[in-house]
Amino acid sequence: MARSIKKGPFADDHLKKKVEAQSGSEKKQVIKTWSRRSTIFPDFIGHTFAVYDGRKHVPVFVTEDMVGHKLGEFAPTRTFKGHAADDKKTRR
């Protein structure tokens, strides 16, 4: 279910403060975060976030197309190993 329009988008305050602090400086460092629930704002464009996926931090470079999505959408939590191989050829 989507968030109510009257509430507006959500992003953690500590994340906004870190982006504002880096916007003033020329050198942009990777912002490490555990906040997968935060919505990507237009201010975040051009910044790199290290989003935690449960075991490591995945680097996510924010582009214009990502605005409005959540940070967690770009750091998958599950690794797909592939389906079992079909052994019909080797049985003959």
From Swiss-Prot:
The keyword Kinase does not apply. Residues 1-27 are annotated as: Disordered. Pfam families: Ribosomal_S19 (PF00203). SUPFAM superfamilies: Ribosomal protein S19. Keywords: Ribonucleoprotein, Ribosomal protein, RNA-binding, rRNA-binding. One of its GO terms (biological process) is translation. GO terms for cellular component: cytoplasm; small ribosomal subunit. InterPro entries: Ribosomal_uS19, Ribosomal_uS19_bac-type, Ribosomal_uS19_CS, Ribosomal_uS19_SF. One of its GO terms (molecular function) is rRNA binding. Residues 9-27 have a biased composition (Basic and acidic residues). Protein S19 forms a complex with S13 that binds strongly to the 16S ribosomal RNA. NCBIfam families: rpsS_bact. Belongs to the universal ribosomal protein uS19 family. This is Small ribosomal subunit protein uS19. It comes from Staphylococcus saprophyticus subsp. saprophyticus (strain ATCC 15305 / DSM 20229 / NCIMB 8711 / NCTC 7292 / S-41). The lineage of its organism: Bacteria, Bacillati, Bacillota, Bacilli, Bacillales.
